[in-house]
Amino acid sequence: FSKTKKMVLQKNPAVYFNNSVALRGNLTNQKNKDISIYLGPNFHFVVYPINQNNDFNFISITRFKDLEEVKNSHNTVKNEILNQITSKTSYILDNNLKNMSLYPVYVSSDFLIPNNKNIFICGDALFAFSPSFAQGASQSIESAFEIFNNLQGIANNYYENRKIKIKKIKNRSNFNHYAFHFSSPLTIFFRNISLKFLSKNNKFLE
């Protein structure tokens, strides 16, 4: 995890291993120029273009509990992930994934800010959400805009606003995570009835 944040905070960042790993790489000569998203059991990956030359980024998040193996056996873990993608999806990598890098995913357990209020931290560096929340990119953009407003003098309460927003996102994302992963038909029935009423509540929708 970021050593820079540790230096800025002058304390260890409050993070923990999320029992998942990220595999990133580059694909070339792709015929499909669209953004592709694949959701599977215990893994998902995204393929998106980075230029007009049919070059693409590939990023996957896979459930993986053995942190020591991730640290010490990169090639073995890479092959396991690639085999899983090949066996459980129709996406064919054809040994075309280059510049692969593998790293464990850490998420934040607490909201920590620097003592120096002239230092602004944003995105995952400020608070790393679980990848399943799908909030990384949007919160990076949103927090960068809030920093801009602070620098322009339009606002002066960046960290206070971020703390409130992060708490809302965590609560809502946790609710969604459990509410939409029910398998019992009876539980799903009552969930759907509850959502019909909640969807009419403006406070719930905020």
Language-model regions, residue ranges each:
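Short, cationic motifs built from Arg/Lys/His that form the positively charged side of catalytic pockets
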Residues: K5-K6, G123, R162, R191
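Active-site micro-motifs of SAM-dependent methyltransferase domains
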Residues: S2, F127-A128, E160, K165
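Conserved FAD-binding catalytic core of PHBH/FMO-like flavoproteins
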Residues: F1-S90
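FAD/FMN-dependent oxidoreductases across multiple families
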Residues: N51, S60-Q135, Q139
